[in-house]
């Protein structure tokens, strides 16, 4: 059955309350340093790719068993499950495209029955993080490409896509979708995007689903 619409979401501080790399940083004893770089990247003060390299380098030596510990500390944003279940019932597809890590995002996607997911992957040797990423880096341009690909796979126009995110890395994706929503976002993001949600309840996105239906 053809999809009725597509929702593409960021993960850290959007679908979930936390920034996973900050939680990993705490485990590495680098919490304050990594959180500082994350904040600068999300507000657009520094380049995302460079910030990712800097932060991942600080995780070098962590055992891969740390992912299970971090996953237990993650909280879905209020309304996340209800939003996704409602959209699936309406015939929509849901995709996650994250500057975070497959090692965590895949588990979230599985639990929520997400249709599509793409994130960064951390390089591992002998059961420990090397301090580098492996494969394609999910940056702002990649997020746009993935949104377009998923829309195309479902024979949807971009006008039938909603995107939700909170960081500077999300701005091009938000402006590519028919409706792009800055979710509890940094000022620079809100200034660049037409639609905003300022309360941490993802069920509010359903109001924009109705708005999209009204456009048709």
Swiss-Prot record:
Biological process, per Gene Ontology: L-serine biosynthetic process
Membership in a protein family: Belongs to the HAD-like hydrolase superfamily. SerB family.
Keywords, ordered alphabetically: Amino-acid biosynthesis, Hydrolase, Magnesium, Metal-binding, Serine biosynthesis
Pathway(s) this gene product operates in, as recorded in its UniProt entry: Amino-acid biosynthesis; L-serine biosynthesis; L-serine from 3-phospho-D-glycerate: step 3/3
NCBIfam families for this protein: HAD-SF-IB, serB
Cofactor: Mg(2+)
E.C. number: 3.1.3.3
One cellular-component annotation, GO: cytoplasm
Biological classification of the source: Bacteria, Bacillati, Bacillota, Bacilli, Lactobacillales
Binding site for Mg(2+): 10, 12, 166
GO molecular function: L-phosphoserine phosphatase activity; magnesium ion binding
Active site: 10 (nucleophile), 12 (proton donor)
PANTHER family per the UniProt record, alphabetical: PHOSPHOSERINE PHOSPHATASE
Pfam families: HAD
Binding site for substrate: 19, 55, 98-99, 143, 169
Entries under InterPro entries matching the protein: HAD-like_SerB, HAD-like_sf, HAD_sf, PSP
UniProt-recorded name of the protein: Phosphoserine phosphatase
Gene: serB
């Amino acid at each position: 059955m053809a999809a009725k619409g597509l929702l593409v979401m960021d993960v850290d501080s959007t679908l979930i309350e936390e920034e996973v790399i900050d939680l990993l940083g705490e485990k590495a004893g680098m919490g304050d340093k990594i959180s500082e770089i994350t904040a600068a990247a999300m507000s657009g003060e520094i380049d995302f790719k460079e910030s990712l390299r800097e932060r991942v380098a600080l995780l070098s030596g962590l055992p891969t068993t740390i992912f299970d510990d971090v996953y237990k500390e993650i909280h879905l944003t209020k309304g996340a499950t209800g939003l996704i279940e409602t959209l699936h019932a309406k015939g929509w597809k849901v995709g996650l495209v994250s500057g975070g890590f497959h090692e965590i995002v895949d588990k979230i996607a599985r639990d929520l029955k997400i249709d599509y997911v793409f994130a960064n992957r951390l390089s591992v040797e002998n059961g420990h993080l090397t301090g580098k990423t492996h494969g394609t880096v999910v940056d702002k341009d990649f997020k746009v490409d993935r949104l377009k690909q998923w829309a195309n796979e479902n024979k949807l126009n971009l006008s039938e896509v909603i995107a939700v995110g909170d960081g500077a890395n999300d701005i091009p994706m938000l402006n590519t979708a028919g409706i792009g929503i800055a979710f509890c976002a940094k000022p620079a993001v809100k200034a660049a995007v037409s639609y905003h949600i300022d309360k941490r309840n993802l069920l509010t996105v359903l109001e924009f689903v109705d708005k999209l239906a009204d456009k048709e």
